[in-house]
Amino acid sequence: MHIPDGILPAAVCGAGYAATAPIVWYSVRKINQEANPRESIPKAAILTAAFFVVSWIHIPVPPTSVHLVLNGLLGAVLGYYAFPAILIGLFFQAVMFQHGGLTTLGVNAIVMGVPALIAYHIFRLRNIRREAGRITTGIFGFLAGSCAIGLSAGLFLVILVSFIGPGFDVEVERAAIYTLAVAHV
């Protein structure tokens, strides 16, 4: 679910960067408000590396293949560290593997990072009860992960269908996008 360079108009790519900047700022602000903000940096670094590496594990799902995303896991485990971690992972995926692109990095960060933050808040709901047992934690972990993937696929679909460039056969592209979105969900 990486949007490559050249698919979206320049204005949409710019809007993606403009929307990413305040989310990164807010995430870093929330991180700095923690009692010891440096304590979770090693955990964030390891999960950022895992997010980067698992993009090489492809699972064939006709008519395409999918790879592990881990944005729900990053959101549940890292909290506000998840958005900067995903942004860094997407940057290295774009530079080294050509998954996505540098012009669409902001849009791809929104597509993957915002659902991770939502997954974090879903996973925190397990603490409503006094004692979150293993079953409760498992249920909320599943909900967080599946909501993150579903929201990412939904954002991907909405952005591509709404803002596809004029140089494409729009009807064929939309049919392909709908098919691939269903395959991802």
Place the predicted regions along the sequence by residue.
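Hydrophobic transmembrane alpha-helices
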Residues: H2-L73
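Short helix-perturbing small/polar motifs within transmembrane alpha-helices
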Residues: A109-L157
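Small-polar-interrupted transmembrane alpha-helices in polytopic inner-membrane proteins
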Residues: T48-F52, A82-V95
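Cytoplasmic-side transmembrane-helix entry/capping segments in multi-pass membrane proteins
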Residues: P37-I46, V69-L70, P84-L87, G106-G113, ...
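Alpha-helix C-terminal capping segments
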Residues: L74-Y81
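C-terminal transmembrane helix-loop-helix hairpin of multi-pass membrane proteins
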Residues: F140-G150, F168-V185
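Interfacial aromatic-anchored transmembrane helix boundaries in multi-pass membrane proteins
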Residues: W56-T64, I88-A119
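Membrane-helix interface motif
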Residues: L157-G167
